[in-house]
């Protein structure tokens, strides 16, 4: 299965970025400079939290 866009998160600079999550590999991607891998998440909600935390200082 491929990664699916599950929502948008705001960076510390208040810009919106799409978040993708691959439910089979658990990989999380953010649309920052292309699709950037930001780690693994156990659920879609966890993926959104991880993406938001990763983007906070961007």
Question: Where in the sequence are the language-model features?
Answer:
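A short, exposed loop/beta-hairpin motif centered on an aromatic-Gly-Thr core
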Residues: 32-46
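Residues at secondary-structure transition points
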Residues: 13, 19, 43-45, 57
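Short linear interaction motif-like sites in intrinsically disordered regions of transcription factors
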Residues: 22, 33-36, 55
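Short N-terminal "domain-start" leader segments
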Residues: 1-27
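Short arginine-rich
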Residues: 39, 53-58
